[in-house]
């Protein structure tokens, strides 16, 4: 084996050896350190040495090339075609060895100073030239000082003809092991303490070229310098300018204001009964109607004896005192789609009024109020019966209207009125199907409101007769009223209108007697609707004058007073006040007979 050296400028010269195989091939091995280590930081030998350590910078790179030929000048490069395995082992040694003093005992070996990965396999790369390369990106030194690296090349042959020539004397060494081929040393480099370490520099172009071809090399594109307060930085002007820029960026980040959070979305719908400024908007989408909702309504149950047969929809979800909302359908009250979300008072609703909100589309826009004339009230009362209801498809209404037996419940603090107090409005006249279907056309809600004079004339010309309200009759033998009359609602006006029924004026002829029945209707559309009935019943006046002591039974007057008060407020576009239902009934006991 013959070794030769070539001149190298940046470090020690490359090393080349020559050998002859068993098959007669002459091979030349040339190894060179193409990237020399320059500096590193001492990592120490404590428990934190493995976690906080800096590798040798830049990482050492060793190049290997293999040639075949009779002479090196005529040799051919066979690095990629030669069938063998190579690896390089690195060791650390001091650049200036120190002589041992005179000691009597044996020399104690120092602990290892090199740490990291000292072994590297050969990588076949095309750049910078086609050759085999050994990289050491993870080498660290424990103590500060000046050192150099020593690289030893080992080879494992694959073919028997590529093995070394057999020696003249047989050896007892086992077959099939690695052969040590050559050794090369790196240039000297310094290891600094943590306080004096200048920092890691940028990655070299050779390291970037290696990383681009898939090797595991750490790439640093910024300078990592240690900045000391009050001292000029050793990194130059670029590091100082970068530090100033970083300080300015940090100050700008601190001056920035925090991005305001978006306002919270109002997921909950505001109730229209608690506020007067609630906007009219469509309700949230409800559930899809089930198959049971599309079924035709069942036939109505037969009413109890002595009561009129009146059916009302039972699908409304608003209840008053346990009774379904709109269970007593006699007077019609137009509502909008927003009424489905209104809060309901705990006071039970008056039996003389009901809402047809269940007959409107659930997502329909609010409609303007419509005055409820006697003809409309009568039609609405009859339209609640299932026989007069037209068959409606599921596309017209979100929920079907199913009939159920009507229940009547009373609050414990209310008094049930007697039958004669309401009997003057219980008679009903025949109604044609055309009047019941008129209320289901949207154009009916947009009709112009007639003047009050037309209403009075209509009231005097045709007085409707309504069916009796289903109230249990008390055990009081009171005479029936002399006449039956029906009040009429007036259109909305800024100022309240007060008048008395002209029918009574015609009957009385301008005279008012205390024992005749009379009605007082006071209407206030600005904020509420008040309906008062006062009836005074007494015996029919006879031709003979009453006794002086007034002891005769027919001279004793029996008076019965029923007062009904209802306050109805609509949404903002109709009335400014919130929704309230007030139902008051009072009954005065007749005076005791002497």
UniProtKB/Swiss-Prot annotation:
Domain notes per entry: The C-terminal PEST domain is a region rich in proline, glutamic acid, serine and threonine residues that is required for the light-dependent regulation of development and secondary metabolism.
Superkingdom: Eukaryota
Oligomeric and partner information: Component of the heterotrimeric velvet complex composed of LAEA, VEA and VELB; VEA acting as a bridging protein between LAEA and VELB.
Its job: Component of the velvet transcription factor complex that controls sexual/asexual developmental ratio in response to light, promoting sexual development in the darkness while stimulating asexual sporulation under illumination. The velvet complex acts as a global regulator for secondary metabolite gene expression. Regulates of the response to reactive oxygen species (ROS) stress.
Main location: nucleus
Entry protein name: Developmental and secondary metabolism regulator veA
Composition skew (Pro residues), residue ranges: 296-307
UniProt similarity note: Belongs to the velvet family. VeA subfamily.
Phenotype reported upon loss of the gene: Leads to reduced formation of conidia.
Low complexity bias spans: 327-351, 384-403, 523-538
Domain Velvet intervals: 24-220
Compartment annotation: Nucleus; Cytoplasm
One Pfam family recorded for the sequence: Velvet
GO BP term, pick one: sporulation resulting in formation of a cellular spore
Keyword Transcription regulation: yes
């Amino acid at each position: 084996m013959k070794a030769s050296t070539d001149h190298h400028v940046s470090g020690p010269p490359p090393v080349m050896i020559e050998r002859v195989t068993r098959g007669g091939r002459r091979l030349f091995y040339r190894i060179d350190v193409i990237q020399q280590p320059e500096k590193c930081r001492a990592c120490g030998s404590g428990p934190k040495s493995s976690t906080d350590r800096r590798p040798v910078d830049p990482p050492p790179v060793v190049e290997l090339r293999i040639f075949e030929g009779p002479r090196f000048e005529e040799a051919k490069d066979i690095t990629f075609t030669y069938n063998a395995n190579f690896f390089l082992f690195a060791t650390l040694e001091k650049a200036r060895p120190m002589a041992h003093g005179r000691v009597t005992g044996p020399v104690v070996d120092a602990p290892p100073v090199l740490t990291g990965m000292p072994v590297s396999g050969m990588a076949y790369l095309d750049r910078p030239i086609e050759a085999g390369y050994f990289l050491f990106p993870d080498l660290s030194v424990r103590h500060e000082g000046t050192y150099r690296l020593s690289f030893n090349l080992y080879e494992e042959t694959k073919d028997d003809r590529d093995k070394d020539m057999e020696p003249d004397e047989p050896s007892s060494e086992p077959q099939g092991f690695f052969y040590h081929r050559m050794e090369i040393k790196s240039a000297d480099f310094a290891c600094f303490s943590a306080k004096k370490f200048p920092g890691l520099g940028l990655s070299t172009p050779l390291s970037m070229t290696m990383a681009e071809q898939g090797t595991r090399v750490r790439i640093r594109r910024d300078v990592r310098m240690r900045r000391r307060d009050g001292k000029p930085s050793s990194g130059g002007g670029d590091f100082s300018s970068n530090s100033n820029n970083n300080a300015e960026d940090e100050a700008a980040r601190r001056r920035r204001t925090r991005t305001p959070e978006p306002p919270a979305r109002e997921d909950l719908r505001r109730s229209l009964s608690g506020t007067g400024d609630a906007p009219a908007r469509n309700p949230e989408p409800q559930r899809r109607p089930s198959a049971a909702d599309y079924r035709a309504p069942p036939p109505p149950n037969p009413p109890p004896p002595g009561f009129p047969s009146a059916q009302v929809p039972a699908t409304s979800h608003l209840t008053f005192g346990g009774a379904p909302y709109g269970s007593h359908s006699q007077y019609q009250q137009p509502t909008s789609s927003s009424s489905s979300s209104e809060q309901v008072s705990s006071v039970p609703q008056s039996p003389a009024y009901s809402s047809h909100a269940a007959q409107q589309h659930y997502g329909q826009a609010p409609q303007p109020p419509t005055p409820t004339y006697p003809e409309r009230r009568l039609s609405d009362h009859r339209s609640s019966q299932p026989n007069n209801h037209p068959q409606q498809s599921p596309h017209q209404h979100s929920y079907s209207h199913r009939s159920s037996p009507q229940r009547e419940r009373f609050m414990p603090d209310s008094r049930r009125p007697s039958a004669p107090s309401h009997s003057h409005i219980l008679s009903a006249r025949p109604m044609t199907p055309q009047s019941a279907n008129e209320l289901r056309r949207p154009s009916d809600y947009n009709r112009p409101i007639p003047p009050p004079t037309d209403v009075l004339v209509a009231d005097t010309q045709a007085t409707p007769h309504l069916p009796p309200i289903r109230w249990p009759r008390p055990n009081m033998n009171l005479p029936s009223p002399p006449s039956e009359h029906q009040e009429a609602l007036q259109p909305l006006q800024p100022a309240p209108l007060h008048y008395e029924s002209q029918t009574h004026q015609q009957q009385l002829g301008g005279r008012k007697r205390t024992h005749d029945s009379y009605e007082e209707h006071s209407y206030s559309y600005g904020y509420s609707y008040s309906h008062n009935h006062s009836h005074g019943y007494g015996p029919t006046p006879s031709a003979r004058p009453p006794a002086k002591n007034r002891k005769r039974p027919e001279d004793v007057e029996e008076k019965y007073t029923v007062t009904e008060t209802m306050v109805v407020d609509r949404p903002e576009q109709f009335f400014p006040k919130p929704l309230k239902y007030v139902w008051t009934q009072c009954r005065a006991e007749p005076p005791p007979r002497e």
